[in-house]
């Protein structure tokens, strides 16, 4: 996988400032939207409040188009448990943001005690080519336009105290800002259109993805600051294990996001 160089090189420094205030979670009527079972079948969504169900040990996948200059925020809320069950599961709810090359940008976890609990991503900057020139992972990760991914995982351990579910889940996604012109690539990415938001993606928000726009990309960034950034293609199927700790360990081994 290749990110093309630029027609004209610009300032090789990260943006000095951006709105890093914790955003207010989006409100409004929730619309039903089941998540996909993997990256290839991730459900398309845009800004809004989305509703589904999640069972212990399950991971849901969503694809979120984010263009140049736009800033993404997301919160996942787990409903209270039914009945009078009591207990506590550490690291029960996990919300993770991946960029278009599937490198981890930010991760939020929350324990569960049977009451309504929410995991919110820490603020990330607007998408900017120059974000690659920083050493801060959650800033550096927002250096591409294109399809970002949100995954929501519920630990299998939740079933020990609160049953097999499923549990109600609300996903609140905000996309702030107007799309801007890109950095001016000198050519096409390989595969094509990897680092842009196309008309189809804008129009398909809220529909279950079929994987046709996936570009068969099992990709990880291995270099992020040079002209013509090369991305390593990885064969195989991406999976997440039942428990969040194992999932995090697997992502660290499989993705090795050094871009």
Description of each model-found segment:
Residues 203-259:
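Hydrophobic single-pass membrane-targeting/anchoring helices
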Residues 18, 50, 68, 220, ...:
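A residue-identity detector for tryptophan
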Residues 62-218:
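Membrane-proximal extracellular "stem/stalk" segments
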Residues 2-60, 119, 161, 177-218, ...:
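Non-catalytic extracellular/lumenal accessory regions of secreted precursors
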Residues 1-2, 67:
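Extracellular/lumenal ectodomains of secretory-pathway glycoproteins
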């Amino acid at each position: 996988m290749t990110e093309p160089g630029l027609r004209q090189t610009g300032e090789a420094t990260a943006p000095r400032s951006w709105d890093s205030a914790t955003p207010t979670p989006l409100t409004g009527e929730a619309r039903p939207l089941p998540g996909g079972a993997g990256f290839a079948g991730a459900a398309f969504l845009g800004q809004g409040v989305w509703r589904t169900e999640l069972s212990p040990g399950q991971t849901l996948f969503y694809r979120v188009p984010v263009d140049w200059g736009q800033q993404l925020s997301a919160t996942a809320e787990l409903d209270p448990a039914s009945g009078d069950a009591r207990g506590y599961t550490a690291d029960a709810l996990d919300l993770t943001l991946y960029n278009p090359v599937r490198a981890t940008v930010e991760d939020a976890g929350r324990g569960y005690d049977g009451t309504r609990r929410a995991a919110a991503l820490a603020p990330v900057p607007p998408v900017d080519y120059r974000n690659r020139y920083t050493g801060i992972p959650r800033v550096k990760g927002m250096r591409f336009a294109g399809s970002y991914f949100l995954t929501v995982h519920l630990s299998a351990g939740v079933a020990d105290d609160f049953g097999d579910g499923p549990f109600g889940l609300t996903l609140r996604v905000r996309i702030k800002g107007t799309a801007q012109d890109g950095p001016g690539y000198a050519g096409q990415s390989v595969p094509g259109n990897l680092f842009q938001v196309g008309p189809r993606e804008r129009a398909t928000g809220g529909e279950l993805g079929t994987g046709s726009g996936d570009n068969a990309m099992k990709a990880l960034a291995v270099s992020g600051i040079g002209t013509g950034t090369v991305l390593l293609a990885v064969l195989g199927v991406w999976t997440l294990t039942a428990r969040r700790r194992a999932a995090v360990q697997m992502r660290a081994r499989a993705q090795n996001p050094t871009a």
